[in-house]
């Protein structure tokens, strides 16, 4: 499957996204039984110019995008670049987002037969998580009571779920005094600690990841009926997540 957060920003630089459902004949090297997705980002197809875009949404969501295209230079070279900054508090408590994304594309038409393309994309990101399931009554006693067969004793007075927390409840974070200077574990190309995302809170579960991808394409038009396409690519990555070590009891 595709984690779209690892490709964040590439849609802002794409010419088109082609979707093919099921197994069928495609002109790609790696067809799939479930289907094929082809993201086209041709720098030579863009006119010269740039744009700045901002998107806002619920939960303090803010996404800022900066894009520039050189257009075709001397009928041979074209460059394209995109930088994205995305932040947000999240819909569920403690599920904030702190992310960047980048895209660089270049195309060089050497002659009538040979064309080269170089691309690099990535999206270093950091998220607060809501990982564990809870009893339905934790979120809504009314909903829990409407379910046939639900044990009412799970939320009677004095029991664990006496007070519902609401749909936005997340047990994987808690507020802390900002004077607390404890740091968060971090593994991004090596283990270390880093400042917490927010000095007023502490996340038990946090995810951080960066999966860059670089590929070099070569297209050789052998004749009017034959083309050779070659791709050399590298895909790296580093990241992980925080969590409770050992056992937790109450």
What residue ranges belong to the model's regions?
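Extracytoplasmic loops and strand-loop junctions of Gram-negative outer membrane beta-barrel proteins
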Residues: 19-20, 48-51, 86-89, 99, ...
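Short beta-strands and strand-coil junctions in structured, solvent-facing domains, enriched
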Residues: 23-27, 90
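Non-catalytic regulatory/gating segments with a bias toward low-complexity or hydrophobic composition
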Residues: 17-18, 37-39, 230
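Short acidic/polar hinge/loop motifs at secondary-structure boundaries
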Residues: 1-21
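A conserved mid-domain beta-alpha-beta active-site/ligand-binding segment of alpha/beta enzyme cores
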Residues: 157-210
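Outer-membrane beta-barrel transmembrane strands
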Residues: 198-243
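Short sequence motifs at beta-strands and strand-loop junctions characteristic
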Residues: 29, 57-60, 94-98, 198, ...
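Transmembrane beta-barrel wall of Gram-negative outer-membrane proteins
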Residues: 49, 56-87, 92-131, 139-176, ...
